């Protein structure tokens, strides 16, 4: 694309024959920012800036000018100039309007013209200095200078710079496309940009358009290729090639299947059948048969041992299951007020039962506390058999509000005969202050007992 360094508003004018009063008497550019001395002599702002820096006097009447701030704007001239009709700068080549400069030099410094539209220059590249009308693709809009700013923001022909990045394998830096295209050609450039990301049609991987051919030919796992060894007509996906070589390829050399029986030759896969038909393989086959017989016999011995072990474990499991019985019950104690009076501390009510044939237990309730915990209702579980056991048990005292039931659970080792563990219930008091646990002068206890493990009784004689 050919590009210019700058376009001035003067060059965009539809009618170049304009009133001389509309141009600066110094630089002869349009008076986009018209300033005047106290005597009314007009020049553009940038020319007055140069004057203030050097002579500090009006170029026409020589009156003193101390600073730019001492000058006044000529709003009438500015208003009339902004009514002039111009071409859209996008009717030519890429331009950006800069209303803060005012010099035909177009160098972008303080002395540049306010009515220039600057075009970025390519470094170390000479740009042509002529206007080229883009008849086919340029904007056809005719507008006033006053309308220019708002038009440029939405012009369909404005220029954009592509920002697509490319990771070049040859260097660590990212390349940028940087191509200049018109806004209304965005979709076309997106479909053509060499750095644009597209998906591989075979495997779906995202690649830059410039790399897609290399990806397909050299890396795509779904590309159909010929086997480099057998070169068969049937094509294979690149990702399946290793499996083909290790399992199917007819031309790959493999070990004889009787290698473990003594044959050390390697043959091509498609010649294996002929190789196995040779006479000397009868000996190898017999060796393999004997080896497998030995393996079978060994496995039979191991299986028999496993069966014996399984019977032993099954018997132990049955015994464990029998000892691991869960017992649940409910003990309702009425006339609780009388019980509080009848059973002072250390005295208890008892409930005896059998968990199984040889597993008797007793539950003891101390209304006024046991010998250890005084003045609080205490419930104890007593083991009435000799064998040491790990037991999980729980006691739950019902409340008139089921959500407030008091549940306590414990797991511990009960040693010998009459060994016991106790749980204390602090919330259960006399009837006058029972916190909802004494319902109609009745205390209800839910309990569960489970023997988790029984230890063997060992007797030693010396």
Curated annotation (Swiss-Prot):
PROSITE patterns assigned to the protein according to its UniProt record, in alphabetical order: MATH, ZF_TRAF
Domain MATH: 326-449
Keyword match Zinc-finger: yes
UniProt-annotated stretches for the region Disordered: 104-127
Record key words, sorted: Cytoplasm, Metal-binding, Repeat, Zinc, Zinc-finger
Zinc finger extent (RING-type): 24-62
Organism: Dictyostelium discoideum
PANTHER family linked: RING-TYPE DOMAIN-CONTAINING PROTEIN-RELATED, TNF RECEPTOR ASSOCIATED FACTOR
Subcellular localization(s) per the UniProt record: Cytoplasm
Family assignment from sequence similarity: Belongs to the TNF receptor-associated factor family. A subfamily.
ZnF locations on chain (TRAF-type): 150-217, 214-273
UniProt cross-references to Pfam families, sorted A to Z: MATH_2, zf-TRAF
Gene Ontology cellular component annotations, sorted alphabetically: cytoplasm
CDD domains: MATH
This protein's domain notes: The MATH/TRAF domain binds to receptor cytoplasmic domains.
Coiled-coil stretches: none
Official protein name in the record: TNF receptor-associated factor family protein DDB_G0267754
MF terms (GO), sorted A to Z: zinc ion binding
InterPro entries in the record: MATH/TRAF_dom, TRAF-like, Znf_RING/FYVE/PHD, Znf_TRAF
Protein role: Probable adapter protein and signal transducer that links members of the tumor necrosis factor receptor family to different signaling pathways by association with the receptor cytoplasmic domain and kinases.
């Amino acid at each position: 694309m050919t590009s210019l360094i700058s376009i001035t508003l003067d060059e965009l004018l539809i009618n170049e024959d304009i009133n001389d009063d509309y141009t600066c008497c110094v630089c002869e550019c349009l008076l986009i920012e018209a300033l005047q001395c106290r005597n009314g002599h007009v020049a553009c702002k940038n020319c007055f800036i140069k004057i203030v820096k050097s002579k500090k006097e009006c170029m026409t009447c020589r009156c003193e000018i101390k600073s730019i701030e001492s000058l006044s704007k000529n709003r009438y001239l500015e208003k009339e100039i902004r009514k002039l009709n111009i071409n859209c700068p996008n009717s030519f080549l890429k331009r950006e309007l800069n209303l803060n400069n005012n010099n035909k030099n177009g160098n972008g410094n303080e002395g540049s013209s306010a009515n220039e539209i600057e075009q970025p220059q390519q470094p170390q590249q000479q740009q042509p200095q002529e206007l080229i009308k883009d008849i086919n693709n340029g904007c056809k809009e005719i507008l006033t200078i006053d309308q220019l700013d708002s038009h440029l923001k939405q012009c369909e022909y404005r220029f954009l710079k592509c920002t697509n990045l490319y990771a070049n394998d040859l260097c660590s830096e990212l390349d940028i496309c940087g191509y200049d295209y018109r806004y209304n050609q965005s979709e076309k450039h997106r479909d053509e940009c060499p750095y644009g990301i597209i998906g591989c049609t075979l495997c779906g991987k995202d690649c830059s358009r410039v790399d897609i051919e290399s990806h397909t030919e050299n890396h795509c796992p779904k590309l159909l290729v010929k086997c480099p060894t057998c070169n068969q007509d049937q094509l294979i996906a690149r990702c399946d090639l290793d499996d083909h070589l290790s399992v199917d390829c007819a031309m790959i050399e493999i070990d004889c299947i009787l290698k473990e029986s003594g044959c050390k030759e390697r043959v091509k896969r498609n010649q294996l059948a002929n190789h196995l038909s040779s006479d000397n393989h009868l000996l190898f086959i017999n060796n393999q048969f004997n080896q497998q017989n030995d393996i079978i016999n060994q496995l039979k011995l191991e299986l028999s041992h496993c069966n014996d072990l399984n019977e032993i474990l099954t018997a132990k499991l049955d015994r464990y299951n029998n000892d691991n019985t869960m017992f649940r019950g409910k003990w309702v104690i009425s006339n609780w007020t009388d019980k509080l009076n009848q059973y002072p501390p250390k005295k208890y009510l008892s409930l005896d039962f059998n968990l199984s044939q040889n597993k008797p237990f007793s539950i003891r309730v101390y209304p006024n506390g046991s010998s250890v915990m005084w003045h609080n209702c205490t419930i104890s579980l007593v083991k009435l058999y000799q064998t040491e056991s790990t037991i999980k048990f729980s006691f739950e005292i019902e409340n008139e509000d089921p959500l407030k039931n008091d549940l306590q659970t414990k797991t511990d080792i009960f040693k010998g005969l009459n060994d016991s563990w106790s749980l204390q219930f602090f919330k259960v008091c006399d009837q006058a202050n029972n916190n909802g646990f004494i319902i109609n002068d009745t205390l209800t206890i839910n309990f569960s007992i489970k023997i988790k493990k029984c230890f063997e009784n060992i007797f030693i004689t010396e």
